[in-house]
């Protein structure tokens, strides 16, 4: 199961690295991103990389993301996995804590890429946040990939 998940993540990243504002094709369907704070960057937020782990899929090996029809708008972060809500009494830095919606349906990835199309192959940087299934999220501002993408490195 790990190999198909890695392959799906890689396929989505490769497809998006060659994109501009036009929708791009992934293994599950078309997605459209949005301009980043730096308009030379396109950001794709909330792309599913597996089927939602709810109901009978709860605590089971992940299954491929179901395909969708049309163009999926990928311009907003997805919910974080279920975890403790942020409080001021936690001993760690506030900006590393989840602030938004939480849900069991939380298997999504975000991609930052230069906004112009390119046929050049680029390295892909995959960052999986920690948290031990207790905390963390791909929407935490400290994990924003725009800085790396704006340097043209990934």
List where the protein language model places each region.
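Classical eukaryotic N-terminal signal peptides for Sec-dependent ER targeting/secretion
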Residues: 1-11
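Non-catalytic accessory segments of hydrolases
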Residues: 3, 16-154
């Amino acid at each position: 199961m790990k190999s198909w998940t890695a392959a799906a993540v890689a396929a989505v990243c490769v497809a998006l690295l060659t994109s501009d504002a036009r929708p791009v094709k992934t293994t599950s369907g078309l997605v459209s991103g949005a301009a980043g704070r730096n308009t030379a960057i396109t950001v794709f937020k909330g792309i599913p990389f597996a089927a939602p782990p709810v109901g009978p899929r709860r605590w089971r090996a992940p299954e491929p993301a179901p395909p969708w029809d049309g163009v999926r708008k990928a311009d907003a972060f997805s919910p974080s996995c279920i975890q403790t809500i942020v409080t001021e009494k936690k001993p760690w830095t506030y900006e590393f804590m989840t602030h938004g919606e939480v849900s069991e349906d939380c298997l999504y990835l975000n991609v930052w890429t230069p906004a112009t199309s390119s046929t050049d192959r680029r390295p892909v940087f995959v960052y999986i946040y920690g948290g031990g299934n207790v905390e963390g999220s791909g929407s935490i501002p400290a994990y924003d990939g725009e800085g790396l993408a704006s340097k043209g490195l990934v």
